[in-house]
């Protein structure tokens, strides 16, 4: 996964790709073609759809009008508040794990190491990386790992050692994947919910920082850029996060010079995460 991910670096690292609101894996596959082509010798990309059906998201129409059905990872705010967080987060986890299992059953091999996402999918990728970091820290201290699935329950998603995330247009805040962090606005569709700032009252200093490597790609013409900068500035450690801004709107860049730079940064970041390609 990185949004979803080369396995061990002597083979390939598996990158999981997560779609944005009102999109799907097929659309993201097309949008990341240039990136995928340049990284194919180091990473294998696996694409996952969100668990919920959705209307087309920003920028999807009219180009991808025939590419439905469209999906989302989070429901709209009014729908969200009617759903128990545990059921919502478990639906996301099972959806991701289903994609991982299908990929492995098809004969794929390699270690899941990174997460990559666009828009709402990037928010999810950052949240999975944070939750993985949280659980690893607790395990190393011999503590009880609590999640919506139960205490100390092994699951495919959380058994992976996620190491880094590539975040295209990813907004704040993080999504809570455990009851202990339910003060995070775990179900707000932040990039389209003007009320999300009132819901996000957590102080993200110290223990709520993502300390694993993250690459934030933000278009300066993106109307949701302020929220995306907040994810970078408020929720990620300055020592391990990198910001790349480009002259674009709410989309994944396809310009060759930008893609080349991003690919180089991703390879450096993967090595920073202690994975060395042989």
UniProtKB/Swiss-Prot annotation:
Keywords from the UniProt entry: Hydrolase
**Pfam entry (one):** FSH1
Q: A Gene Ontology molecular-function term?
A: hydrolase activity
The answer to whether the entry has keyword Secreted is no
- Identify the EC number(s): 3.1.2.-
UniProt keyword ATP-binding, yes or no: no
Active-site residues? 119 (charge relay system), 222 (charge relay system), 250 (charge relay system)
Enzyme class at the top of the EC tree:
hydrolase
Which InterPro entries does the UniProt entry name for this protein?
A: AB_hydrolase_fold (IPR029058), FSH-like_dom (IPR005645), LovG (IPR050593)
CC terms in the record's Gene Ontology section: cytoplasm; nucleus
Reported phenotype of the disruption mutant:
Leads to the loss of T-Toxin production, resulting in low virulence for maize.
User: Which Gene3D superfamilies does this one have?
Assistant: alpha/beta hydrolase
What processes does the entry annotate via GO biological process terms?
secondary metabolite biosynthetic process
Pathway given in the UniProt record: Mycotoxin biosynthesis
Q: Which family does it belong to?
A: Belongs to the LovG family.
* Chain's role: Probable esterase; part of the Tox1A locus, one of the 2 loci that mediate the biosynthesis of T-toxin, a family of linear polyketides 37 to 45 carbons in length, of which the major component is 41 carbons, and which leads to high virulence to maize. One of the PKSs (PKS1 or PKS2) could synthesize a precursor, used subsequently by the other PKS as starter unit, to add additional carbons.
Tell me the protein's name. Probable esterase TOX9
